[in-house]
Amino acid sequence: MNVRLIATILLLSGLPALAQKEVSPGVFEIGKVRINKQKRTIEFPAVVNMKEGLAEYLLVSTKGKVHESVLRTEVEPFQVHVAMLLLGGKGAQTNFFGPDKPSGDPVTIEISWKGFLSTKRVAAEDMVFDRARNRPMSKGSWIYNGSFQFEGLFVAQEAGSIISVIADPEALINNPRERRDDDDNWTINSKAVPSVETLVTVTIKVPRTSPGEGGASSTNSRQ
């Protein structure tokens, strides 16, 4: 997406313009968010926020619902949003999810951290336990729905919601699996999550093709 167009989107959303710094060919940084255009990945730091309990969110900002999230980050939601736009992510930008899977761009999410001898890497879904299936969340993509605007504000930024396990159009990324409307079904898979306050890296990968892209109309009113 054109950088000038992104700047216009930020202005219309009431968000500050962002300076992107090229750290190597095809690799850019926006704050603490690193964008690799060739690999089509976004990376940024976070910490383990909880190791047990209900998992309504996989990741929130420090001003988000930290009492319900596996991870938290100091990175701002709008920085992640701009990084996704730079990789061609569109999202659905709707404030309403129907019974079908959320519309948007499929992405994969990996969490990594330094272990005793080597770097540990797990799929984000490994960190969440599906009570109905009595096993970790099924493997597969998440959906970048892109949140939405309300009265000139970018809602993900206001709510601090980045990756949601339960259905939440305010978040940037949502879980498309069955039972996403059941707040009590998802818990933290403590076997796959390191100790609280462990530093981790969140890596979001955007496929070159998006077969599930689009399908929902854009709106700017909450329901």
PLM region spans:
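Sec/Tat signal peptide C-region and signal peptidase I cleavage site
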Residues: 15-19
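Long, low-hydrophobicity ectodomains and other hydrophilic envelope-associated domains
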Residues: 21-223
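N-terminal secretory signal peptides that target proteins for export/translocation
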Residues: 1-2
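Sec-dependent N-terminal signal peptides
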Residues: 5-14
